Amino acid sequence: MALEMRLPKARKPLSESLGRDSKKHLVVPGDTITTDTGFMRGHGTYMGEEKLIASVAGSVERVNKLICVKALKTRYNGEVGDIVVGRITEVQQKRWKVETNSRLDSVLLLSSMNLPGGELRRRSAEDELAMRGFLQEGDLISAEVQAVFSDGAVSLHTRSLKYGKLGQGVLVQVSPSLVKRQKTHFHDLPCGASVILGNNGFIWIYPTPEHKDEDAGGFIANLEPVALSDREVISRLRNCVVLLVTQRMMLFDTSILYCYEASLAHQIKDILKPEVMEEIMLETRQRLLDQEG
């Protein structure tokens, strides 16, 4: 049995070395954003006594004359085209209910998915009876937002071979505000693992497949044993994601890769120790600043 004793370490607050990220205009509910009446009121704001006031805690964003406040911690608000990772919670008539970290359950229609083998035909009664064979409660899927209803509920689709059931890997749940929007959210990292950065804050880390089975239609999960080296890479990436989230840094492929490379000098179990987290975070942040400028 290994016993580890650690003493408190005097260290400067991390906020003293935040660099450019500290210049964000942060507000709390009740703060006055501006007294200029020429601006339009956006999400997270309201007008009071001819002043624009914040109604949520977050960062102020301005687009031309529109001012809104992006909450630091919130549920996922779906937008058409978003990539999400979700968990099947219920099988219903011609549809699945999916948990996507939003206020309401999302919906995946039977007509919005590829049939096994990629067949292009109308869904029949036999397909409806076999729905639980395609996806059942507890299964994880990757999908794209097809539509957003007036009440905020989200409709999903998996009409591409890159979407579908997820096999073996690790799921990390973070705040959706920390996931950076990019052209692609599927990344094969050079360290030997892949990540899906869901816009809804669900991060899926899995071993990079050698080849994709296109005949499966995205609904056959690979359950072969994962090699120890791959499991170690996945565990290290998972701890790196948790580290970045703890330090409120944006999640995208470059930040995760830089954090992974900075953590190679430490054991996986030591990454989340406070003094190690500070060392890795400072190196990661410096590399990102060097890349920007």
UniProtKB/Swiss-Prot annotation:
Instruction: Cite the CDD domains for this sequence.
Output: KH-I_Rrp4_eukar, S1_Rrp4
The residues covered by the S1 motif domain are: 79-159
Q: What GO CC terms are in its UniProt record?
A: cytoplasmic exosome (RNase complex); cytosol; exosome (RNase complex); nuclear exosome (RNase complex); nucleolar exosome (RNase complex); nucleolus; nucleoplasm; nucleus
What Pfam families would the database entry show? ECR1_N (PF14382), KH_6 (PF15985), RRP4_S1 (PF21266)
> Which compartments is it annotated to reside in?
Cytoplasm; Nucleus, Nucleolus; Nucleus
The family database entries (InterPro entries) matched by this protein are listed as: Exosome_cplx_N_dom (IPR025721), Exosome_RNA_bind1/RRP40/RRP4 (IPR026699), KH_dom_type_1 (IPR004088), KH_dom_type_1_sf (IPR036612), NA-bd_OB-fold (IPR012340), RRP4_S1 (IPR048565)
Q: Which molecular function terms from Gene Ontology are attached?
A: RNA binding
Q: Provide this UniProt record's keywords sorted from A to Z.
A: Cytoplasm, Exosome, Nucleus, Phosphoprotein, RNA-binding, rRNA processing
Residues annotated as region Disordered?
1-20
According to its UniProt record, where is this protein mainly located?
cytoplasm
GO biological process terms, semicolon-separated: positive regulation of cell growth; RNA catabolic process; RNA processing; rRNA processing
Task: Supply the SUPFAM superfamilies for this chain.
Answer: Eukaryotic type KH-domain (KH-domain type I), Nucleic acid-binding proteins, Ribosomal L27 protein-like
Q: Which residues carry this modification: Phosphoserine?
A: S124
Family of this protein: Belongs to the RRP4 family.
Entries under PANTHER family matching the protein: EXOSOME COMPLEX COMPONENT RRP4 (PTHR21321:SF4), PNAS-3 RELATED (PTHR21321)
Q: What does this protein do?
A: Non-catalytic component of the RNA exosome complex which has 3'->5' exoribonuclease activity and participates in a multitude of cellular RNA processing and degradation events. In the nucleus, the RNA exosome complex is involved in proper maturation of stable RNA species such as rRNA, snRNA and snoRNA, in the elimination of RNA processing by-products and non-coding 'pervasive' transcripts, such as antisense RNA species and promoter-upstream transcripts (PROMPTs), and of mRNAs with processing defects, thereby limiting or excluding their export to the cytoplasm.
Tell me, how does this one assemble? Component of the RNA exosome core complex (Exo-9), composed of EXOSC1, EXOSC2, EXOSC3, EXOSC4, EXOSC5, EXOSC6, EXOSC7, EXOSC8 and EXOSC9; within the complex interacts with EXOSC4 and EXOSC7. The catalytically inactive RNA exosome core complex (Exo-9) associates with the catalytic subunit EXOSC10/RRP6. Exo-9 may associate with DIS3 to form the nucleolar exosome complex, or DIS3L to form the cytoplasmic exosome complex. Exo-9 is formed by a hexameric base ring consisting of the heterodimers EXOSC4-EXOSC9, EXOSC5-EXOSC8 and EXOSC6-EXOSC7, and a cap ring consisting of EXOSC1, EXOSC2 and EXOSC3.
Q: What is this protein called?
A: Exosome complex component RRP4
Native source species: Mus musculus (Mouse)
